[in-house]
Design a protein with these regions (language model features):
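Bacterial N-terminal signal peptides that target proteins for export
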Residues: 1-9
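C-terminal motif of bacterial Sec signal peptides marking the signal peptidase cleavage site
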Residues: 16-19
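Extended, solvent-exposed segments with strong compositional bias
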Residues: 83-144
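Short, surface-exposed binding/anchoring microloops in extracellular/periplasmic proteins
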Residues: 39-106
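Bacterial signal peptide processing site
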Residues: 21-23
């Protein structure tokens, strides 16, 4: 059905839709588990995280996007997390993204005392033809910002990747969700 506003309006709508599209790719939640601080360094080939947290929620996610390729033209790519919706003022603490079993070229902005990923490597697709990534979420905070406790009160966790320093300015991925039910199951399995 032709637009009653003509081809110019249709072209403008297509341009605006493209501008709103995620430029860092689309990511899909895969799973979440509760891990001790010591379990973080080995699978990611970078220096151990020395942040003072005893445990993390390790969020597994995947994409068709190769973050090493995207990182070639960007200053930094960071994971962002919050209680859903993503603009919740809580500001959940998250480290990443990291490639599963592989180091990323990206240098995410890291808190003091936390090491960034090591040297770049060629990322390989998993058995499903996707790139596998992780982010490490601090499951509870009682000071230094609004408090939250995903161990005692699991909630849906919204995540997104943000980039800076690219030709297009600030860029982002889609928002993907680690459901409260998956977090609850991870906490129960990690508590055994």
């Amino acid at each position: 059905m032709p637009s009653r506003h003509g081809p110019a309006a249709a072209g403008l709508l297509a341009l605006l839709s493209a501008a709103c599209a995620p430029t860092l790719g689309a990511y899909r939640f895969e799973s979440v588990d509760l891990v001790a601080r010591e379990a973080i360094a080995a699978p990611n080939d970078f220096e151990p995280i020395t942040a003072p947290y005893r445990a993390y929620l390790r969020v597994h996610f995947s994409s068709d996007a190769n973050l090493n390729t995207l990182a070639e033209t960007r200053e930094a790519i960071d994971a962002r997390a919050d209680l859903c919706p993503l603009d919740d003022p809580t500001g959940v603490v998250v480290l990443g993204p990291y490639a599963v079993g592989q180091a990323l070229a990206i240098r995410a902005r890291m808190p003091d005392g936390v090491a960034a990923p090591g040297l770049a490597r060629v990322l390989e697709r998993d058995e499903n033809g996707r790139y596998a990534y992780t982010a490490y979420v601090v499951p509870a905070r009682t000071a230094g910002g609004p408090p939250y406790d995903l161990l005692e009160e699991p909630q849906d966790l919204c995540l997104r990747l943000d980039a800076t320093g690219g030709a297009a300015g600030a860029e982002r991925s889609n928002v993907f969700v680690a459901p409260a039910e998956a977090i609850r199951a991870a906490v129960a399995a990690g508590s055994r």
